[in-house]
């Protein structure tokens, strides 16, 4: 039971808190009103049935003491002896409760890491199957209090699956691959950081949502992590995580015996290689006795692996598994294996087939402490994919699902995208193996195929930024991941409401507003990025951030759309295409094979159709594209006004931080909308029935203005500039001026200016009306926003600034002065003069 419903009406009108950085996340333990009667109804003592400081039970006692004080102003003493339930919280394991208190008969049956929480007036029992479970129960109790829930309860809960891990793609130099929240909290300059204070804070957050394992380094691993001095550093990290019930594991580079060990081979059948890995494993466990195990990316995207020596992927995984077996360690072996040099000229080639092609023949050949870690979809964390068919093809192999909290393809934390509704499309999908219920969530738990291991992994990539992920709102995804890994049937809306109450307080207006924004965010992003199963139409060859649909095709990466002037989509049918649909069990395969039974939202994933193909909605494919992109961008505009309605209810620091990102998202969603619509309008030659695409009556194109020191510039990709053209200063030392006489009716408008904010310079612009300064700004988004910057004029650097409520008279003279800096030539795309209520 995680839900917390405030029982005091006054809690819905709590005022603004002091400024907050976000460092505490959902563990901020904000004060909840608790008068004298409330205070007297709370326990006065905390009994921890383990006094060892490295014990999660001891930590539970400290968390309870701190939480009671911060949330309710209650000072509770902590002791490790006694079993009196009078005005006490007793926290410990089932075994300790039975031994020390001569009790425990009433404790329900618990699975590994499960706990029982019993609240009876001033008597609280928190009993875990393990010490980790006891800590989880303590966090559960505190979560209830922090949400104003003082209910008397008695219930037991156990995890959905034994493996609930997070992955960090941290590099030894301190950078983080696909990380948008600052540098690594673990590594710097090739070694483990001396200051690991952020690690302890991260451990608290993870434990509070019941995460029990972490891989601390990038799957594209650097063998230098295995040097003795770095092993010592890993031990320091593990010592910090241990009291929070979190076991540390590491990613391995398959070729380490050669690159680090100076062996002539890394063949997994070679005795010297086997011995080398055995010695490394022994050294690690000597330092970290409870190490979780290894994560391995092999024979994928240039990473070395066993197939170099004509060994199977199972051969490679089992080599590590046997080294770990004496210590109880686990190998998480990624199923993300594919050839990124395949030819699109072959109609039957399909990257989506790779996982099943590689792993299905190996089912039953992996050792029992190997878990195959499978991305939720067949390609790569796209805005919508079908469930990976590999889940339905490994009956005799342990599996785990791989999700992504970091928004690599989904806005990189510069766009609000609440991900659980996307994840639930996969977790709740019934693969119908052998015509029996086979939900993905029941397969990864081990339940469906009676497997001993299984579970969850999520790529998180927190960094040293005080918001952890680069955005306050993005933390809802980390919170929700932990919640779902424990209980995947939870409702996405209920989860985000709990997170909102814990993060922003109990004000009903805040809860309702942020719930609406969050639940609308993924559909909006899908609408303005890529829909109908076409994938996220981002630049797959560069940043994975802004729009560039052409980048999907014409290369070996296999994220093809096969779009031409007549048709679009991948034919993945057995009858005519790549035969991918046939990788599913019969009932699902039949659904996807037939265009009539394929859901519209996956039509272009499974079928190659004309732009004029009618959907079940009655719209053509191309008109759906146009409409969806306009709808998505319009929704993104509403996020700003919704958030602004909370101005007086949220501390200024977090309010402004979020507002900056939502304003940016509103502008960038229009960049996305126009780029995708212009691209397919140009490609298909089919007009928008509503005459919006290519028609912008409120715009003034920069290249049509009177230019002095500015020159026109043909932007590439062409669709990422209005009318395909921008302006740049004639040189990096030249100030540019663009002027125009405005031919709009006299009135009050929002004045928007679309420009490009490139990495490598911080240009400065000033906008004037009749020589009166309207506003000025600097191109410094690389210092403000989290997404990967670009050195080009493109869909990544394109953005908008808006000056609101500007009084304009017909015939006013608009002037923009741009001063270049570094490599950035003060680029401008267009000006838009928007009447109230109009979305450009």
UniProtKB/Swiss-Prot annotation:
A single GO molecular function term of this UniProt record: alpha-glucuronidase activity
Alphabetic keyword roster: Carbohydrate metabolism, Glycoprotein, Glycosidase, Hydrolase, Polysaccharide degradation, Secreted, Signal, Xylan degradation
Record bears the keyword Glycoprotein: yes
GO biological process: xylan catabolic process
UniProt key word Secreted: yes
GO cellular component: extracellular region
EC number: 3.2.1.139
Primary location: secreted
Subcellular location: Secreted
Catalytic reaction annotation: an alpha-D-glucuronoside + H2O = D-glucuronate + an alcohol
Glycan attachment points: 50, 149, 222, 262, 279, 310, 465, 527, 576, 610, 682, 723, 732
Xref: CDD domains: CBM6-CBM35-CBM36_like (cd02795)
Signal peptide feature range: 1-19
InterPro entries, alphabetized: A-glucoronidase_C_sf, Glyco_hydro_67_aGlcAse, Glyco_hydro_67_aGlcAse_N, Glyco_hydro_67_C, Glyco_hydro_67_cat, Glycoside_hydrolase_SF, Hex-like_dom2
Top EC class for this record: hydrolase
Annotated family: Belongs to the glycosyl hydrolase 67 family.
PANTHER family, A to Z: ALPHA-GLUCURONIDASE A
Task of the protein: Alpha-glucuronidase involved in the hydrolysis of xylan, a major structural heterogeneous polysaccharide found in plant biomass representing the second most abundant polysaccharide in the biosphere, after cellulose. Releases 4-O-methylglucuronic acid from xylan.
Name the record gives this protein: Probable alpha-glucuronidase A
Naturally occurring in which organism (per UniProt): Aspergillus fumigatus (strain CBS 144.89 / FGSC A1163 / CEA10)
Gene name of this polypeptide: aguA
């Amino acid at each position: 039971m995680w839900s917390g419903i405030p029982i005091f009406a006054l809690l819905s009108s709590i005022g603004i808190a002091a400024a907050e950085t976000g460092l505490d996340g959902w563990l901020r333990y904000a004060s909840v009103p608790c008068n004298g009667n409330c205070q007297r109804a709370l326990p006065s003592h905390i009994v921890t049935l383990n006094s060892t400081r490295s014990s999660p039970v001891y930590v539970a006692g400290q968390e309870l003491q701190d939480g009671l004080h911060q949330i309710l102003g209650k000072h509770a003493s902590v002791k490790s002896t006694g079993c009196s339930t009078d005005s006490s919280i007793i926290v410990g394991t089932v075994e300790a409760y039975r031994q020390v208190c001569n009790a425990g008969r009433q404790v329900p049956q618990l699975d590994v890491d499960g706990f029982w929480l019993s609240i009876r007036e001033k008597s609280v029992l928190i009993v875990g199957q393990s010490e980790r479970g006891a800590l989880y129960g303590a966090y559960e109790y505190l979560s209830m209090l922090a949400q104003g829930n003082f209910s008397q309860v008695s219930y037991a809960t156990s995890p959905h699956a034994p493996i609930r891990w997070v992955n960090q793609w941290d590099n030894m130099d301190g950078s983080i691959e696909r990380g948008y929240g600052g540098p690594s909290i673990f590594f710097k300059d090739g070694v483990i950081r001396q200051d690991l204070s952020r690690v302890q804070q991260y451990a608290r957050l993870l434990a509070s949502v019941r995460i029990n394992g972490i891989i601390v380094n990038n799957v594209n691993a650097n063998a230098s992590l295995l040097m003795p001095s770095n092993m010592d550093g890993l031990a320091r990290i593990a010592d910090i995580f241990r009291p929070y019930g979190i076991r540390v594991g590491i990613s391995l580079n398959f070729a380490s015996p050669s690159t680090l060990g100076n062996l002539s081979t890394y063949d997994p059948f070679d005795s010297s290689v086997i011995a080398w890995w055995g010695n490394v494993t022994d050294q690690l466990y000597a330092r970290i006795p409870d190490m979780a195990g290894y994560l391995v990316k092999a024979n994928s995207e240039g990473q070395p692996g066993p197939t170099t020596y004509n060994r199977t992927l199972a051969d490679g995984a089992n080599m590590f598994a046997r080294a770990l077996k004496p210590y109880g360690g686990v190998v998480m072996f990624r199923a993300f294996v594919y050839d990124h040099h395949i030819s699109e000229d072959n109609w039957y080639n399909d990257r989506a087939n790779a996982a099943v092609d590689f792993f299905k023949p190996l089912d039953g050949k992996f050792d029992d402490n190997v878990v195959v870690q499978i991305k939720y979809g067949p390609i790569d964390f796209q805005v919508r994919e079908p469930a990976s068919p590999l889940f339905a093809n490994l009956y005799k192999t342990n599996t785990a699902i791989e999700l992504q909290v970091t928004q690599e393809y989904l806005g990189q934390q510069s766009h609000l995208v609440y991900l659980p509704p996307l994840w639930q499309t996969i977790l709740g999908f019934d693969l119908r193996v052998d015509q029996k219920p086979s939900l993905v969530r029941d397969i990864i738990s081990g339940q469906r195929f009676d497997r001993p291991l299984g579970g969850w992994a999520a790529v998180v990539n927190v960094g040293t930024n005080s918001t952890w992920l680069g955005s306050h709102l993005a933390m809802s995804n980390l919170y929700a991941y932990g919640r779902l890994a424990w209980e995947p049937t939870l409702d996405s809306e209920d989860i985000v409401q709990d997170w909102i109450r814990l993060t922003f307080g109990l004000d009903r207006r805040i809860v309702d507003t942020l719930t609406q924004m969050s639940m609308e965010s993924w559909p909006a992003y899908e609408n303005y990025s890529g829909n109908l199963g076409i994938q996220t139409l981002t630049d797959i060859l560069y940043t994975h951030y802004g729009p560039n649909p052409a980048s999907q095709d014409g290369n070996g990466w296999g994220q093809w759309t096969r779009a031409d002037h007549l048709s679009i989509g991948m034919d993945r049918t057995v009858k005519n295409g790549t035969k991918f649909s046939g990788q599913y069990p019969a009932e699902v395969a039949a659904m996807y094979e037939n265009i009539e039974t394929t859901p519209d939202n996956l039509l272009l994933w499974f079928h190659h159709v004309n732009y004029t193909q009618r959907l079940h909605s009655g719209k053509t494919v191309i008109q759906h594209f146009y409409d969806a992109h306009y709808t998505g961008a319009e929704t993104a505009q509403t996020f700003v006004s919704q958030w602004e309605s909370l101005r007086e209810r949220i501390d200024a620091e977090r309010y402004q931080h979020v507002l900056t990102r939502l304003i940016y998202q509103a502008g960038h969603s229009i960049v996305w909308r126009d780029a995708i619509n212009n691209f397919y309008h140009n490609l298909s030659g089919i007009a928008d029935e509503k005459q919006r695409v290519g028609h912008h009556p409120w715009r003034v194109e920069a290249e049509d203005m009177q230019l002095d020191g500015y020159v026109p510039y043909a932007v590439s990709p062409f669709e990422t500039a209005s009318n395909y053209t921008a302006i740049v200063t004639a040189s990096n030392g030249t100030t540019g001026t663009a002027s125009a006489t405005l031919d709009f009716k006299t009135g009050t408008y929002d004045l928007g200016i679309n420009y490009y904010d490139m990495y490598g310079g911080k240009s400065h612009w000033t906008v004037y009306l009749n020589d009166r300064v309207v506003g000025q700004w600097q191109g410094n988004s690389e210092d403000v926003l989290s997404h990967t910057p670009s050195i080009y004029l493109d869909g990544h650097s394109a953005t908008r600034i808006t000056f609101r409520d500007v009084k304009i008279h017909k015939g006013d003279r608009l002037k923009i002065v741009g001063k270049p800096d570094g490599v950035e030539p003060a680029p401008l795309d267009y000006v838009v003069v928007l009447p109230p209520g109009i979305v450009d």
